[in-house]
Regions:
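Transmembrane alpha-helical segments of polytopic membrane transport and secretion proteins
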Residues: 1-44, 292-319
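Transmembrane alpha-helix signature in integral membrane proteins
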Residues: 42-43, 91-126, 285
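Generic hydrophobic transmembrane alpha-helix motif, especially the helices
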Residues: 81, 91, 112-119, 125-196
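Short hydrophobic alpha-helical segments within the ABC transporter permease transmembrane module
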Residues: 94-98, 138, 145, 186, ...
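Transmembrane alpha-helices
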Residues: 100-116, 210-242, 289
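Glycine-rich helix-loop "coupling/hinge" segments at transmembrane-helix boundaries
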Residues: 143, 154-158, 238-281, 307-308
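C-terminal transmembrane helix and the adjacent membrane-cytosol boundary/short C-terminal tail
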Residues: 160-164, 177, 223, 227-231, ...
C-alpha cells in the first residue's frame, strides 16, 4: 500500500546506493511507471486521444456545422471515415469536438478539485480546534446536497445562468461536488503529519503557517493528490457522459461524448456507427486513465519490487 504519511520511508527509499550509485526518488517513480507495460499503454492511448481531440480535424474536410445533403445517415466511407448522422453531419468532426470537450472537462475538474481538496484539508488539519470544527461542518453540509438536482437546475439555466455555455455550467457544478471526499482524506492524513517532529519544530520556530502547509504537509501527501487527479479526470468524464445521457448535462449546440451517445441510443439498430464509435472512444479514454492510475499507484508504493531491479540495473551500468 502506498505510504503517503511517512516521509522517512520515502526518503530512505529514494536513496538506494550500490557502489556509489544513488537513485533519486522522482527517478525511481518514473522508472517504476515506465516498466509497467499496462500503465505505459494507458499513457499512449490517452495521449493519442488527446492529440486526436486537438488535431483530429485535419483528418476530415468537414466540420460539425456543415451538412452533406448527399450523404445523410450514411455508414463509414472514404468521404466520411466514421459515417454521417441523420442530419448529414460528419461523425468524425463530431467525435473530435466531443472528445475535446470531455477531456477538457476532465482536466479542469480533476486539477482544480485536487487543489481545493489540498488547501481545504490541510487548513483544517493545521489550525484544528474551532476552525476545523466549522470547516468540517460546512463540508458535511455540502456533501448532503443532492448533486443531480443541482446539475439539473444549473444546466437548465436556473439562477440566471442561461448565457453561459452548458459545458462550463457542468464544470462549475462538478467542481462544487468533486473535492469533498478527498478533502476529508487530506484532513485525516495531514492531522497525522501535524504530529511529526519536523512540523512541530517548524511551528516552534515561528515558521509562517502558509509555508508549513505548502512546505511540509502538501508534499507529503503528493502521491494521494496525483492519484486523485487521475481519478478525478475519469470521474468527471463519466459524470459528464451520465448527465448528458439523461439530458441534464451538456446541451446542443455544445457537443460531448455523452451527448453523442445519448442521441444515438434509440437508433442503434438503424445507425449503429453513431452509437458504437463515441462509446468506444469513451471506453478507451476512461480505460486508459484507469490503467495510468494503477501504474501510478504501484510507482508510488515504497514496497514495490521494481526498486530492486532499478538498483541492479544502475549498479551494472556503473561497473
Amino acid at each position: 500500500m502506498t505510504n503517503i504519511i511517512d516521509p522517512i520511508a520515502e526518503i530512505d527509499e529514494s536513496r538506494v546506493a550500490d557502489q556509489d550509485v544513488v537513485i533519486g526518488k522522482s527517478r525511481i517513480i518514473f522508472r517504476r511507471f515506465m516498466r509497467n507495460r499496462t500503465a505505459v499503454a494507458g499513457l499512449f492511448i490517452f495521449l493519442a486521444l488527446f492529440l486526436f481531440s486537438i488535431f483530429g480535424g485535419f483528418l476530415t474536410s468537414w466540420d460539425k456545422d456543415t451538412i452533406d445533403p448527399l450523404n445523410i445517415g450514411m455508414p463509414p466511407s472514404p468521404d466520411h471515415l466514421l459515417g454521417t448522422t441523420q442530419a448529414g453531419i460528419d461523425l468524425m468532426a463530431l467525435i473530435v469536438d466531443g472528445t475535446r470537450t470531455s477531456i477538457l472537462i476532465g482536466l479542469i475538474v480533476g486539477g482544480i478539485s485536487v487543489l481545493i481538496s489540498a488547501v481545504y484539508g490541510c487548513t483544517m488539519a493545521f489550525f484544528g480546534g474551532k476552525v476545523d470544527a466549522v470547516m468540517l461542518f460546512i463540508l458535511e453540509a455540502l456533501i448532503m446536497m443532492p448533486a443531480i438536482l443541482v446539475v439539473a437546475v444549473a444546466t437548465s439555466g436556473g439562477g440566471g445562468l442561461k448565457d453561459l455555455p452548458s459545458w462550463l455550467l457542468l464544470v462549475v457544478v462538478l467542481l462544487f461536488f468533486s473535492w469533498m471526499g478527498t478533502a476529508r482524506l487530506v484532513r485525516s492524513l495531514s492531522m497525522s503529519l501535524m504530529q511529526r517532529d519536523y512540523v512541530k519544530a517548524a511551528k516552534y520556530m515561528g515558521v509562517p503557517s502558509r509555508r508549513i502547509v505548502w512546505r511540509h504537509l502538501v508534499p507529503n501527501i503528493g502521491s494521494l493528490l496525483v492519484l486523485d487527479f487521475t481519478r478525478g479526470i475519469t470521474g468527471a468524464i463519466l459524470a459528464e457522459v451520465a448527465f448528458s445521457f439523461i439530458g441534464i448535462g451538456i446541451k446542443l449546440p455544445d457537443v460531448s461524448l455523452g451527448v453523442l451517445i445519448g442521441q444515438a441510443t434509440g437508433q442503434v439498430s438503424s445507425f449503429p456507427w453513431m452509437f458504437w464509435v463515441p462509446l468506444t472512444v469513451m471506453f478507451l479514454l476512461t480505460g486508459s486513465l484507469a490503467m495510468m492510475n494503477d501504474g501510478l499507484r504501484d510507482a508510488f508504493d515504497p514496497s514495490s519490487s521494481s526498486i530492486g531491479r532499478a538498483k541492479t540495473k544502475t549498479a551494472k551500468a556503473g561497473k
